[in-house]
Amino acid sequence: MSDTGTKRRIERFDPAIEPKWREFWEREGIFKAGRRAGAPRRYILEMFPYPSGDLHIGHLKNYVIGDALTRYYVIRGYDVLHPFGWDAFGLPAENAAIKYGRHPREWTYGNIAESKKSLEIAGIMYDWSREVTTCDPDYYRWNQWLFLLLYRKGLAYRAKATVNWDPVDQTVLANEQVDAEGRSWRSGAKVEKRELEQWFFRITAYAERLLNDLDKLDKWPENVKTMQRNWIGRSEGAEVTFLALPPGADLHAPPPPDAEPLVVFTTRPDTLWGATFMVLAPEHPLVSKLTAPERRAEVEAYIARARMESEIERTSATREKTGVFLGSYAINPVNDERIPIWIADYVLMGYGAGAIMAVPAHDERDFAFARQFGLPVRVVVQPPGETLDGATMTEAWPGDGVMVNSGPINGLPVGKGEGQSVKATIAWLEANGKGKGTVTYRLRDWLISRQRYWGTPIPMLHLPDGTIKPVPEDQLPVVLPEVQDYLPKGKSPLAAAESWVNTIDPETGQPARRDTDTMDTFVDSSWYFLRFCDARNDREIFSREAAHRWMPVDQYIGGVEHAILHLLYARFITKVLYDEGLVPDDEPFRALFTQGMVQRRVRTPLEVVAPGMVRFPEELRRKLELPADAQSLDQARALLKERGYTLEEESNGGFTAVSGPVTMSKSAGNGIPVGPFVRQYGSDVARIVVLFAAPPENSMEWTDEGVAGAQRFLNRIVALFSPDREEIVAALNSGNGAAPEGEERALYRKLHETIRKVTLDTEQFRFNTAIAALMELLNEASRYRSEAGRVTPVFAQTAATFARLLSPFAPHLAEELHSWCGGTGSVYDTGWPEWDEAALALDEVEIVLQVNGKLRGRIMAPANADEQQLREWALTNPRVLSFVGDKTVRKVVVVPGKLVNVVV
């Protein structure tokens, strides 16, 4: 498109230009993947959202970053895949639908339409032909296919387990969905423990690969990789089997036939000789069998209390230790000693096998427990230069030293190396058949069952004889039925859909019941990036050819809050599919960028009740615990200051309470809807504010001043180039290729400095400094145009190049400027400008003059001046001569282009 026919003096940026360019991009398929077949490819992806309805400006940052990168690579000639979709199943959609009294499907698709409209008006360009929605049967069919693949490989299984139960959402949660305080990631409710039959994905089978392959991800933030390493939690040690004696067993006799093996994992097997009691997690499956009858009531009461506590509470180092003796004993395999078995809440089923050998002399938690209940403390490590006595110790000694009271390893130094205690103990255990060296992980298998309606049905059948078998692949998808009552009840609402639940096994003709749980919504997002490669394939999850064309994702963009959940699951599923030969790489995301948040201050008007007196509104009062009665301005100011707020006087005489910067959200009341803002100010203004305010990995504050600054920048572009559009076109068409001279040389150099700066900064996500460089170029071009008094070829070249450099950041105005310069078609088909190294060479450089290494002056010299010229200029410089005086010059050191040092 070109708009050079008439000369109009447009002095300000007009947002009304934007719709025509969005329509043009869509019509011409400028951002459609495959448009440049054979070109180098780029796959850029932002994490897809829950469809929450009309987007606010805070949502845009993630998408603007991805869009800027996409536009940069499109104009550079790449074939770019930049798709979009909707993470539409799961608790967020279902809970919102319940809250507003609408069916989840109606609520979800209505919000998708609103959200899509917001993205389109914001000028975020996606290849919408590849759009996916996870609640569509043609998407979740492949969730079910994936489940069956994992089931065939032994990676999906059903087991009874102690699970995390959300009492508000009435469903099970994976460990990763419970925060450090033991609360649900969605509802915030205190999580309870329940015993339930559930479906799991065996992610632990990939623990070692998930851990080791983090080292390959050199374009991921270190903090994200550290979080994953800590969550996987690799520990080296030994598995040792104790024998648990039944209650009432003779402690002096050989173990009876019904003695139970009790497997313990320890990272310090060398301290086995110091174990004086055992502790089981309250949830351990042997607790009931090992409990003496007279202790059963006390034990069961303790277990009930432990189930109400979070893991963080149970493992707190400062909390007083609690526990109950079961009334039974275990045999320590290294010395045949009978030691008492307790339960205590500081031991978790999630660590090792839910059982520990307690060595109170050398573990602080065990020491506190032993002192609390009067249990013996036996020293097996003596620190250098000290002699510890278990009876008088005031704290555990977990450090280095020499082994004592430890049979075959007495005298060895503590450590894991050759000839040290840990390695020697493992060798002794293995040689004597009492244990083995092993590795364990904190990571637990992924619990995917959910007792909620709005999710992917699990494609399994339950037969009358108790057999559980998969639905045949040709019967997929198992479609989620329409139900009217989908409120959470503690079991899946699907269980009440009798006509759906009761079915026939297609292979045997027997009656069967469908599984009524649905899948965790994180299954949906664990592979969606692969579906984008081949989104309309109705024969397979995606073709190998499409996956090999596009995968892995070159740049993934999203919040750091997904470091453990989504990103870990996506890596796991990708490795499974890699092992099946379906994808070309076993890591899904080559590079990861985690953006900061958009923040805005919350402004709350106060009620003026009398001159100098105000009253806080009720909502603010409740939120900040403020008094209800009227306050003087000084009192109000002091109360607000204590809570991180300020009091501002408005121009109309009113007063407003202003918070500090708060993440923009609907709940905080500080969101700015995308649609109204873009219609008033323009998408390009919003984009410049978001990209210029701060480095994109940092949080940024959205302010009126930032909006005004972005407007000024775009207005200045229009004011500088629009009035000269005809002259610019004529100058560009003149074919004058002469090298710039004089004043033109300075603008030409600045132009190429800017090309280099914007190129390098854009590729490094330094969008704010790239835009700052464009502002500097605009200043230089404006000064040059004013002094030249006319349009010259170098000014015209600057205008045309400016359009291309601006295109990732303010794309609508970039297209408009491109058309003013006589461009036809899209600016994105013109190619990215290359900088000229010769143009960057300076005509003159500053030379530092020194005498005996001390600064004595500066001169400007031609950049190509040789050593002899620089030497002569230095030795005749009046300031240098004044410091040399009548002394003899012994040596002159010349560093061309930098300095001359006269040594006397």
UniProtKB/Swiss-Prot annotation:
GO cellular component: cytosol
Catalytic activity: tRNA(Leu) + L-leucine + ATP = L-leucyl-tRNA(Leu) + AMP + diphosphate
InterPro entries per record: aa-tRNA-synth_I_CS, aa-tRNA-synth_Ia, Leu-tRNA-ligase, Leu_tRNA-synth_edit, M/V/L/I-tRNA-synth_anticd-bd, Methionyl/Leucyl_tRNA_Synth, Rossmann-like_a/b/a_fold, tRNAsynth_Ia_anticodon-bd
GO biological process: leucyl-tRNA aminoacylation
EC number assigned by the record: 6.1.1.4
Subcellular location(s) per record: Cytoplasm
Binding-site residues for ATP, renumbered to this chain: 666
Domain of life of the source: Bacteria
Main location (coarse class): cytoplasm
PROSITE patterns attached to this UniProt entry: AA_TRNA_LIGASE_I (PS00178)
Annotated GO MF terms: aminoacyl-tRNA deacylase activity; ATP binding; leucine-tRNA ligase activity
SUPFAM superfamilies reported in the protein's UniProt record: Anticodon-binding domain of a subclass of class I aminoacyl-tRNA synthetases, Nucleotidylyl transferase, ValRS/IleRS/LeuRS editing domain
Keywords recorded for this protein, A-Z: Aminoacyl-tRNA synthetase, ATP-binding, Cytoplasm, Ligase, Nucleotide-binding, Protein biosynthesis
Ranges spanned by the short sequence motif 'HIGH' region, renumbered to the chain: 49-59
Record motif 'KMSKS' region, residues: 663-667
Family: Belongs to the class-I aminoacyl-tRNA synthetase family.
NCBIfam families given in the database record: leuS_bact
HAMAP family found in the cross-reference section: Leu_tRNA_synth_B (MF_00049_B)
Protein name: Leucine--tRNA ligase
Originating organism: Roseiflexus castenholzii (strain DSM 13941 / HLO8)
